[in-house]
Amino acid sequence: MEEHSDWILDEIGVEIHDGEALDLFRQAGARVDGRQARFEPGLVRALCATAPPAFQMFGRNSASDITVGGDSVVFVPAYGPPFVSDLEGGRRYATIVDFENFVKLTQLSPWMHHSGGTICEPVDLPVNKRHLDMVYAHLRYSTKPFMGSVTSVERAEDSLQMARICYGTDYLDNHCVIQGNINVNSPLVFDRVMVDSLKAYARANQGCVISPFILGGAMGPVTQPALVAQALAEAMVGIALTQLIRPGSPMVLGVFLTTMNLRTGAPTFGTPEANLATYAIGQLVRRLNLPLRAGGHLTSSKVLDAQAAQESGDTMLVGLQAGANFVLQAAGWLEGGLVIGYEKFVFDLDRCGSHSRMLTGLLVDDNTLAADAFREAGAGSNFLGVSHTMANFETANYQSDLADDTSFEQWSADGSLDSAQRANLRWKEMLANYHPPPFEQDVDEELRDFMDSKKASDEDRWY
């Protein structure tokens, strides 16, 4: 598959809608003909070599700093849904209030390490101005690293400028606090909007997540080895371009590979074929020594049900087993990414907590071998009251916020609530208890002045 990726780049090539990018690749040794760039085997891989295998992202306080790459795993909420849903309101278009709510829920959760980007599309705001309110929400209501806009170079630059206002221009030049989520226009096309945004973030020494989005049978061949080779080729070209712009800039090699129902054209998630492809891409990205984006709680289900749990669980677990470092879409995803659900969001948060515990591995030491507990309990007794149990019971096992392990009688007395109903109560409780983190008044005023100035400079556009 790695050799086939080189074959794709050499024989088929990649279409790039940007003259500067084509010039950079030509100077680096690519064969450029019009918009088409072709690469000798190994060239793109060599150009990726300056990208760091791991890097830090910095939050507004040190407790929110994270490492991307190496043995670290970063959970990131859903990205891009235009709709939201909850038990009372059903499925509806998202608003800026919903966006702010999900930023707050993310801030409150110890299992979301990153504030995300377009957690949902606030369609009540003009298309050309909503990015300002989204970036402000990340900066104001969270302390965690986040993603900025990539839907135009102007919006990317606005996102970077707002980060500079908050963190300082000199600080931003040496500290990664913001990323751009760059999607390849599969198959094998880098469009002008994405390349412009990629260049903006790379020049600022901020991160990019380069992600081919490939449905087998639509944007790529139907067979998984071909999809893996295509995804690797596309992502490597994006990483290589960032390194030609600014060597050493922090990047994540992302993949979004899944199958589709070949009778209806609908995307499918958690399928064995997609999971096998994820395992393969994980091994190939390790050979490149780059951080990997994969996995997520993905599902085609419209509600929080058994299908949602099964598909989400399979996709997430496989991504983690494949070695994913950056897990976008880790909370809230429903309906193939069209919807972010409040109940699904907190349900996924709970699962991320469980996965985080599993990823810590098995510690073997004197305490966990518990020789004193065996001595105290002896044969034929139980361990409930021994000193070792008393000393370890609070941390011995992961305690779910949502799972019900009471008796049938107690569950009935408590209202016979199912998972979705318990999750509904949980997200409301979390928002009721949210308190915004401290924020400097002068920074807040400067951000608002910047937003007001940008909004006043252009008429509202809804397309």
Language-model regions, residue ranges each:
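Glycine-rich, N-terminal phosphate-binding loop and its surrounding beta-alpha-beta segment
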Residues: 23-90
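Catalytic-core signal marking the mid-to-C-terminal active-site face
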Residues: 1-4, 12, 17-24, 343-463
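Short acidic (Asp/Glu) and glycine-rich catalytic loops that position anionic groups and cofactors
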Residues: 26-31, 177, 215, 258-261, ...
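Hydrophobic alpha-helical bundle architecture
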Residues: 278, 282-384
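Helix-rich catalytic cores of soluble enzyme domains
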Residues: 94-321, 325
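N-terminal glycine-rich anion-binding loops that anchor highly charged ligand groups
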Residues: 1, 13-26, 33-35, 73-76, ...
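Short juxta-domain linker segments that transition from a proline/glycine-rich
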Residues: 74-78, 98, 107, 349, ...
